[in-house]
Amino acid sequence: MIITTWIVYILARKGAGLPFPPKVSSDVEVTETEAVSVVQHWLKKTEEEASQEIKEKMSTNFPPMQGQDVHVTRDVVKHHLSKSGLLANQSQEVLEERTRIQFIRWSHTRIFQVPSEARNEAMRDRIEQVRRSICHLSDEISQELRNRNSYSEC
């Protein structure tokens, strides 16, 4: 159904003399530097918020001696959390670790722009493939109808 709708849309545009795909693209161009800067900003903000929350939790559970600065590392946090019994909810820890891993994977992902020629060529290939499929199906249907008509005449 979806393929048929697209084919009708494409054929209607071609019949009206309009190009497919339209020459004016509504897509917003994304460059790698913009994406990287957004990810870095978000990561920095998240790390600052997490560090602040951890410092607050540690200061309420283990108040530092006067004049001591609180330095937060993953090892210290895990050590204090396991001692204080805050790791009762293991599923939350697993979820946070998975989220962290996914974020790291996503932050290392590169964003590449596909040249419009390659995109147009891929679109033409796909349209041609769909046309061949439709022609093949219509040939099969017409052959089947001929066979039914020949059987009904007998």
UniProtKB/Swiss-Prot annotation:
Any one GO biological process: spermatogenesis
Pfam hit, one: SPATA19
Chief location: mitochondrion
GO cellular component, one term: sperm flagellum
Record's keyword terms, sorted: Cell projection, Cilium, Developmental protein, Differentiation, Flagellum, Membrane, Mitochondrion, Mitochondrion outer membrane, Phosphoprotein, Spermatogenesis, Transit peptide
Residues bearing the modification Phosphoserine: 26, 116
FT transit peptide: 1-24
Location in or out of the cell: Mitochondrion outer membrane; Mitochondrion; Cell projection, Cilium, Flagellum
InterPro entries noted in UniProt: SPATA19
Role summary: Essential for sperm motility and male fertility. Plays an important role in sperm motility by regulating the organization and function of the mitochondria and is also required for correct sperm midpiece assembly.
Identification of the protein by name: Spermatogenesis-associated protein 19, mitochondrial
Species per Swiss-Prot/TrEMBL record: Bos taurus
